[in-house]
Amino acid sequence: EKLNDGFARDLLELETCIAHIADAPETPALQPEALQTLNAESVMESQYLPRAALRIMRFAHNIHAYYDAVVHQKSQPRCEATPLWLAVFRDDDAVWRLPLSRGEARLLIALQKEKTLSQAIDLAHTDMLAENEDVAALLHHYLQRWMQHRLLSHTHLPQAQSLERNMQCA
């Protein structure tokens, strides 16, 4: 089947992204133990910083299925326009692709912009609600998935909130 221009452009963007991710600096993955020390308020007011070798991309075509078929020498799917959000990341010197929902992608993009989890949820709330009315359960699912795929680098409480909390304890 002849590739259309939009599909070819998406495929080129993915290939370029994979090359950049392969060269991006490696940052250590967040370990689950780091989350165990946070209380409920700290969880929401912390920043969860994604790893440096992570890009969130939006495509007009499902190039992930096509790329996967080519890599694994399967029959190639039709190159129809199907919107796709995709995380492209490196872990242990291997480049990976992970399809995302729109809400999950919007949340990760907000975290890349150093928003707190609470701020990121505010930005992605409408998209998350479209997926599941139980935003808390959806958030739990996202965090589990991100930890499983090692997408996050570290977490920290923004300085102003940390200082305020220390003053309240004094």
Residue map of PLM features:
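Sequence-level detector for tyrosine residue identity
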Residues: 48, 66-67, 142, 149
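Intrinsically disordered, low-complexity boundary segments flanking structured domains
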Residues: 37-46, 71-76
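Hydrophobic, aromatic-enriched interface-forming segments
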Residues: 24, 40, 45-55, 59
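Long, charge-rich, low-complexity alpha-helical segments
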Residues: 1-39, 93, 98-170
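Low-complexity, glycine/alanine/valine/leucine- and proline-rich hydrophobic stretches
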Residues: 50-113
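A general structural signal for short secondary-structure junctions and capping/turn motifs
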Residues: 10-11, 44-49, 77-79, 144
